[in-house]
Amino acid sequence: MIEFKDVTKTFDAKQGAVHAVQDVNLKIEDGHIYGIVGYSGAGKSTLVRMLNGLETPTSGSVVIDDVNITTLSGAKLRAQRQKIGMIFQHFNLLWSRTVLENIMFPLEIAGLSKVDARKKAEHLADLVGLAGRETAYPSELSGGQKQRVGIARALANDPQILLSDEATSALDPQTTDEVLDLLLSINQKLHLTIVLITHEMHVIRKIADHVAVMEAGKIVEQGPVLEVFKRPQQAVTKRFVNEEVTPSLNDTTVVVDQLLAKYPKGTIVQLTFHGDQAQLPIVSEMLKKYPLDLNIIEGGIHQTQEGAIGSLYLQLTGDQEQIKGALAYLQTMRVETEVLNRE
């Protein structure tokens, strides 16, 4: 288990003390994929640097499997770091080395014989989908293939934890999904704890099971991914969720004003579906019971590791009693309903 206990990190600057991380308390269970999401400057990277001992907390402690790594130094800290692999946005490959030689590099540093290092590197190349590309140089690889080399290299010393710091930020959407699928597969095969640092809720939604949202150095919200998607509490969380679920309405501070200006008539309703609800014809059944004119403004269904989450914006026009009946029906079907206006 990973635990952050009352962790604060302060940097001295000309303008005074800068609190990069403030009073963070967080638990990450073994074998989970835990996402930490926030915009630039939220404190995500500082937090992860404290996890592998590259930064020391100003106060508080970071504990991994009952070992307080903030008290370690020298050989003990180096031994602890060997239990943690890390992948980055920029691949940090050795351009004069082949794929296999890049994967072998940390094994050579660890003292493995060349024969054993090569054998293990070949296995890792196959694990990350690079069989047949072992003799290629980084300049001959696509961005996704380079990141696969980075992942294989991070796994070389059999870490218990894999840190991913914006590892898909430089990749196109299709390659991002392929790399995320690989990380999910590795998590399942190796029972590896993965900590994802990202500013993209898509990354969290696709493979994480738990998420913490950071803003201004603080964790403002945390919980199972599906629960956070279903009921975001903080403004920054709502913005992240809307960016993923309803991308064309991604600024929660202006969503309602935009909708009311564009659709001045009728009743504008936001529906949120969870799990099996997202697969059922609930809206069409509603229209059979309550004959209304319906305009679908925006919508989408996305999968998380714990189930589907769907969001739908509707414009309903017609008899007010019929509209009230329709909204009551949706609530009986356990669809979360928010009326943004009334005609």
Swiss-Prot record:
- Which reaction is catalysed here? L-methionine(out) + ATP + H2O = L-methionine(in) + ADP + phosphate + H(+); D-methionine(out) + ATP + H2O = D-methionine(in) + ADP + phosphate + H(+)
User: An example Gene Ontology cellular component term from the record?
Assistant: plasma membrane
GO MF terms here are: ABC-type D-methionine transporter activity; ATP binding; ATP hydrolysis activity
Alphabetical keyword list: Amino-acid transport, ATP-binding, Cell membrane, Membrane, Nucleotide-binding, Translocase, Transport
Compartment list: Cell membrane
ABC transporter domain ranges (all copies): 2-241
- SUPFAM superfamilies assigned: ACT-like, P-loop containing nucleoside triphosphate hydrolases
Q: Where does ATP bind?
A: G38, Y39, S40, G41, A42, G43, K44, S45
- EC category name: translocase
* Topological category with respect to the lipid bilayer: Peripheral membrane protein
Question: PROSITE patterns of this UniProt entry?
Answer: ABC_TRANSPORTER_1 (PS00211), ABC_TRANSPORTER_2 (PS50893), METN (PS51264)
**Any idea of its EC number?**
7.4.2.11
PANTHER family per the UniProt record, alphabetical: AMINO ACID IMPORT ATP-BINDING PROTEIN, METHIONINE IMPORT ATP-BINDING PROTEIN METN 2
What family does the database annotate?
A: Belongs to the ABC transporter superfamily. Methionine importer (TC 3.A.1.24) family.
Q: How does it assemble?
A: The complex is composed of two ATP-binding proteins (MetN), two transmembrane proteins (MetI) and a solute-binding protein (MetQ).
Question: What does the UniProt function comment say about this protein?
Answer: Part of the ABC transporter complex MetNIQ involved in methionine import. Responsible for energy coupling to the transport system.
Q: What's this protein's name? A: Methionine import ATP-binding protein MetN 2
- Native species: Lactiplantibacillus plantarum (strain ATCC BAA-793 / NCIMB 8826 / WCFS1) (Lactobacillus plantarum)
- Protein encoded by which gene: metN2
